[in-house]
Swiss-Prot record:
It comes from Chlamydomonas reinhardtii. LRR repeats lie at residues 182-205, 210-233, 238-261. It is found in: Cell projection, Cilium, Flagellum; Cytoplasm, Cytoskeleton, Flagellum axoneme. This is Dynein regulatory complex subunit 5. Disruption phenotype: Defects in DRC5 give the sup-pf4 phenotype characterized by disruption of the assembly of several other N-DRC subunits. Belongs to the DRC5 family.
Amino acid sequence: MAAPNLITPLRDICVKVVAANFEGCPTFGPLPDKYVKRIIDILPLDLPLELVGSLIADEDYWRRRSQARWKNCEVAAHGYSWKQLFFERNLMEFLEQYDPAVTDLSSLKRLLTYSRRFVQTVHIRQLPSHLDLQILFECMVNTPSSLALSYNLKEVGMDYDRSLFGMKLSDCRALAKALEHTETLTHLDLSNNSLDDDKVRMLASGLVENLSITHLNLSHNKIADRGVRALAKLLDGHSVISLLELHDNQIHTEGAESLARAFKSNQCLLSVNLRLNRMGDEGCKAVVESVRGSPTLQRLNISANAAGPGTAAAVVALLRLNNTLTELDVSCNQFGEDACGNVRRALEQNGSVRLMDVRMTGINPDDEMAIAENLRARQERVDKARVLGK
């Protein structure tokens, strides 16, 4: 029977001493990896970020630190990295709570500067300070790659004031200037920001000089025809935007026709979402006809736009002539039973579409069931081919 170890080994004492004094002496020296790991496992979780950010890459440390601060941590939304999660959420909270009357601007700039190496996505749910976003891009050189920004206000209660919500024209002007120079931002989400035509035109002045943004989300705003005309100019032959989301706005026929003219020369768009607008039959028809010969477009959504038989005829031609489109949503329109029958027959001749929504278009149950069975059989063939590696 082995004698009990009554004396703590010197190496264990050293590990504890190094961990306890890490803030004053932030180095691991030439220690073997197994001792470095033991030190990190007992490091305090309140060490300054500027200190541990560059020295500690161990994911277990950042997991413990994240879970100690927040109850719900979805690491998948942060590149499956606990370190990235911590820095992104820490920056998000600081920006959302930033008050220039209380916190010095230099503190914000310092946080942005030392966080930039570990941050890919900036997601801001409220920005009551209406901070000049040029500061963010100037400090975070070469980052972020994704910006989701919402000018809402949480927990307002009885102090509710409609003017506190949404982007101001000055916010759009500052962001437009920043967008002219950023070269790493690929995803811009400005949904639900009360953007109207004047604000979108201001943003477009910066977007026209931008060659990095590939995913643009301006949904759930108040963009009408004048604003859409400005956006259409961004979608020329030199555009790099591949995902365009304009659903739930106020786009009418004229705006739809402006987009249609731009779509004809565009060689980059992969997905366009225009649902919940007011394009009408003529506007939807123009959009569908414009993408008939597109060599790139894979997803198109024009649901809930008061489209009629004219659009249905354009959809029939699209299905017969286009072989790149894989998803099409025309639900909640007014095609009529006869037009929907033509759509069903055209789909049978099409070999590329795998998802198609024709609900609430006046289609009879037999045609709707036939379309569903057709698409289900196609998907089964695709799944089988994927399993077999074909």
